[in-house]
Amino acid sequence: MSALNSLPLPVVRLLAFFHEELSERRPGRVPQTVQLWVGCLLVILISMTFEIPFVALSLAVLFYGIQSNAFYTKFVAILFVVATVLEIGSLFLIYKWSYGEPLIRLIIAGPILMGCMFLMRTHRLGLVFFAVAIVAIYGQTFPAMLDYPEVVVRLTLWCIVVGLYPTLLMTLIGVLWFPSRAISQMHQALNDRLDDAISHLTDSLAPLPETRIEREALALQKLNVFCLADDANWRTQSAWWQSCVATVTYIYSTLNRYDPTSFADSQAIIEFRQKLASEINKLQHAITEGQCWQSDWRISESEAMAARECNLENICQTLLQLGQMDPNTPPTPAAKPPSMVADAFTNPDYMRYAVKTLLACLICYTFYSGVDWEGIHTCMLTCVIVANPNVGSSYQKMVLRFGGAFCGAILALLFTLLVMPWLDNIVELLFVLAPIFLLGAWIATSSERSSYIGTQMVVTFALATLENVFGPVYDLVEIRDRALGIIIGTVVSAVIYTFVWPESEARTLPQKLAGALGMLSKVMRIPRQQEVTALRTYLQIRIGLHAAFNACEEMCQRVALERQLDSEERALLIERSQTVIHQGRDLLHAWDATWNSAQALDNALQPDKAGQFADALEKYAAGLATALSRSPQITLEETPASQAILPTLLKQEQHVCQLFARLPDWTAPALTPATEQAQGATQ
């Protein structure tokens, strides 16, 4: 700890980030890492044995292709086959009509690249067009490197083998031989979330970060999509299982902030918590067996009173609703999403995005051809890889690519100087490469915030030490050239994406926040009563709120990287946005607490007050886009005598008023958090 205290704050934050990423627990991560690791070693063995070129490209296919579950791996493998046909076909067309004419070749390749980048952003199968764009621009380097058309054709045909045999390999490993099914990952994930919930129910633990809670909720939703596509039994009983996922998410996120020591430890409360934990354990056992859980628990009057006293009544109701739900309930028909985004042909940003990518590639190609420096062809690949919809995400990808390339270059340098002279055969080579590939595979299976570092590290290492050589290599020039090519491409892309039609999210962020607060207002309008339909709607919208707040958080991080904005305005926007996100999360949990007390009352007394809260929140959200939002001030009216039996409800609603008053005032020249107390609210 003393060593960390002596380090600069940015270094400490970087170390904390990598610790979080490398220690991430995710169902399916270990099998995916092992599959990727074994696949990389097999690719090296096969490529070296049969002298197949472009080993780095084969490794890249594996890193992009092997996914967290068998269904996703199979789906990506099919896309890769289609992409290989399209990309090789486009290359042959370019070579046929313009092999000896670089200008004509670029004129033909340019529209292909633009079309691919446009479709990558607007089409559901954007990964296919991304692969075609990569090969279309990479293939322009073949005629420049070689003067013999026959050799270029052979290299292009080799690209078919290089792309397809790793695809076959990952299908055998990840789909046929050692499949990791989404259904088993879902069972494990649900049980892990319930284990965390029980721990917070029985012990006084520090709450987990809200960002982690939201990511876990989104991970369950993604697994649910894969289970629907991959498992017939899950599809048959999908309504029950989707309700199970929503219930587990609610229990997990709510108990994360639960502190059992803040309530009196009466015998009735202790027994109720034990009973609730026992029911959760029964649900876990049913999930492990892959069965729909049915409960015969009927809450007695004393248990209901104990649940209300320890603020667990709503959790109890959601659990019982799941246990009494018919497993054969017909699912709600899901709307099929369109293949293209709605504004694909009306929003000029998509075409501008394609033009910017083409411009960056042409600048790099001109420099690459002008200096006649064959080794820096990675600059053009970099322009395509780091091309993202907005400035912030492009900078994020640039940092990841540069970081991965730097680590890969350092490893390649050490490998060439210290290890390569001592190697005599392929077995020794595989033993030395094994820890490098294992590290890259583990990083590549982390979250999207850092996974590309692992991919880029291994690809850069392979480009510098294993590319098109089938024996010991001691040329350090390759390491220098690949790294410089990536740096050149990163610099050119940064300049283009910053100054040519920059797509800033600074204006989109307030709209995103308004959408999240609008969903929160919908939650407040749902009748607070023990009714199945209302409860299910409440849980589903609550999951949507997790996704909305997480998206706003990620957008804040991207806006922080947009250096073309005024620094003071950017800092003010980020500070206000983070305050809204924080207060929105607190409002959601505070509103959960009002449900526990309001359920015991006649619901007819509640809609007016709930509507008052929702109206104030909608008014605040409506002014975010124009920066006209002020902190809502809500006055609570006198409590009717019929509600005096539950004074806790009044205190909880007063707390909601305080949270409303702490929302930032967007009309102020500087962010001054509201410290004054809301009218009608008490501390």
From Swiss-Prot:
* GO CC terms: plasma membrane
Record's keyword annotation contains Ribonucleoprotein: no
Residue ranges crossing the lipid bilayer per the database entry: 43-63, 75-95, 100-120, 125-145, 158-178, 402-422, 426-446, 457-477, 483-503
Q: What GO MF annotations does this protein's record show? A: transmembrane transporter activity
Compartment annotation: Cell inner membrane
Write the record's keywords in alphabetical order, separated by commas: Antibiotic resistance, Cell inner membrane, Cell membrane, Membrane, Transmembrane, Transmembrane helix, Transport
Task: Give the Pfam families listed for this entry.
Answer: FUSC
Q: How does it sit in the membrane?
A: Multi-pass membrane protein
Q: Name one GO biological process term.
A: response to antibiotic
Coiled-coil spans are none
Q: What is its main location?
A: membrane
Whether Transmembrane counts among this entry's keywords is yes
Q: Which family does it belong to?
A: Belongs to the MdtO family.
Q: Quaternary form?
A: Could be part of a tripartite efflux system composed of MdtN, MdtO and MdtP.
Q: Which NCBIfam families match?
A: PRK11427.1 (NF008510)
This molecule's function is given as: Could be involved in resistance to puromycin, acriflavine and tetraphenylarsonium chloride.
**Protein name in the entry:** Multidrug resistance protein MdtO
Gene symbol here is mdtO
